[in-house]
Amino acid sequence: MTAHDQSQSSYDVIVVGSGAGAMTSALFAADQGLSVLIVEKSDKYGGTSAISGGGIWIPNNHFFAAIGGQDSPELSMQYLKAATGEHGDPVRLQAYLDHAAPMIKKLTDNSRVRYAVADKYPDYYPQLPGALPGGRTLDPELFDTSLLAEELPNLRKPSPSTLLMGRIAWTARDAHKAMARSFGWQWLIFKLMARYKLDFKWRRKSKYDRRAALGSSLVASLRRSLMDRNVPLWLNTNFEDVLLDGDRVCGIKVATGGKILELKARRGVIFGSGGFEQNQTLREKYLPQPTRASWSATPPGNNTGAALEAGLNIGAATALMDWAWWAPTIAVPGEEKPRGVFAERAFPGAIVVNGLGQRFVNEAAPYLEFVDAMYTDNHKTGGRSVPSWVIFDGHFRFTYAMGPLMPAQVVPDSRLRKEWLNTVYWKADSLEALARQIGVDTQGLSSTVEKVNRYAQTGVDLDFDRGGNVFDRYYGDSNIKPNPCLAPLRKGPFYAMRLDAGDIGTKGGLLTNQHAQVVREDGEPIPGLYAIGNCSASVMGISYPGAGGTLGPAMTFGYIAANHIASGVSATASNKARVLL
């Protein structure tokens, strides 16, 4: 399937990239009778989607309605307008709301992709009008990877942080139950491990679970669905530039197998190849400083902004270039990329401080806002918040995970890799000694911990209201009272881990209209060119409305792009986009 049949050099649609949005667009284009080619620069397919949680934020979805959930287009738009503010384009937002629910219904009805509703996963901004305490995020079901046959080795491996014990598949719903230590969590872990251990035939082939979960499940099920449709996917095929016929994009130039090929696209080219987070030059040009490509939790060598630069060269407009899908990350020696720190920041008994030993943000806040606060505080303190430090005590270490550290009751310090000490984590018998090790103000840290310990007793964080809303509490420990996100730091030894200002992709990119067409500075579409996912400026503006706020729009606008191409509608003035500053 991934062998290059170069006897065909002309297709109706060419898709650049192989993440969830790219493959979704290819699938819907193929289902409307169009010939489709996918090209991928890497030797693996799946992109950042494959290492992600795979969740998609889909308001008014049929899964939620089926269990009696209450949502509406009006409520969803109220929330999105409040979340995106001046950075939101009402026309694009309306297009998203109009097409997201139909997209996932058609996809799950006509492919191997399977989702379930995360009915207790809240929107990220529960304080805003129109927010729901659950039901808009969908979680991929497990997928049997043996169905991929010869394409299995080409699937990008999931991040170790998305697997139980680094090898066992579980859904986001299972992971939440275990992390929140909800009733029955230990029995759940036992069942998952038993299922894995008893699959003797598969374990003789691989140490990884037969089943894919999260983003790996989404990508695997999409790839199998494309195999069912005989849609070719060329790996090791580097996008070089677009081909033009007048002002119309009519194909692409690629490098593969030591050759430069010109591939014609009769109906359209869809950019779905990710952002520019792995391009240090572009990071330094556009993003807040300091910034490092090595801090990004996305695969190194990919997402270097080739589509962005090609679009700029033909007059495309851009927006939101100084924003990313921020997420704090922890570097782990021997791993190709750092790990994002998501749920752990809400666990009780850990705090995050700057170099002054002071807290500067609600640790349980959404990850985009968390890193944004790192940069804001870094500016205020003269460079003392990038990096920041997560601090926890011996009780936390025994009970909870943090980044690559499993709870010590499962993996004690004696079983950790020796090279991790003073690189991944720092350890000392007292807070003062720990502060000196990591270069944090000792008095500042001691005072901060004393204050947090008082807050843990009362259950009220007077500084940042940690645990004060349903989103914070989602990953809190339900057994901890009165606040599931607050516990004292008292029991030595004490630990620290460095948090970098990382990301899971860039947010800015080529500006598009409601049809996913790339537009020029005057808002007019560039004929034949579409962009989705992190190639494009996010429809969500500078907000992150809920889990799956990246993949949901990527897949939805992939669906929109495929439909627009299939319809044969020509560009008109009504297709103008609002240019965001």
Question: Where are the predicted features?
Answer:
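Extreme N-terminal leader/targeting segments of oxidoreductases
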Residues: 1-13, 31, 216, 220, ...
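N-terminal Rossmann-like FAD-binding beta1-loop-alpha1 element of flavoenzymes
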Residues: 13-38
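An anion/pyrophosphate-binding glycine-rich loop and adjacent beta-alpha core
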Residues: 126, 132-134, 141-188, 308-310, ...
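Internal hydrophobic alpha-helix adjacent to the cofactor/substrate pocket in enzyme cavities
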Residues: 310-317, 446, 553-573
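Glycine-rich loop(s) and the adjacent beta-strand/alpha-helix scaffold that form part
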Residues: 209-216, 228, 256-335, 339, ...
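Helical element adjacent to the flavin cofactor pocket in flavoenzyme catalytic cores
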Residues: 200-266, 308
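Conserved N-terminal/central alpha/beta ligand/cofactor-binding core
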Residues: 41-232, 352, 359, 398, ...
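A glycine-rich dinucleotide-binding beta-alpha-beta segment and adjacent secondary-structure elements
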Residues: 241, 248, 444-539, 543
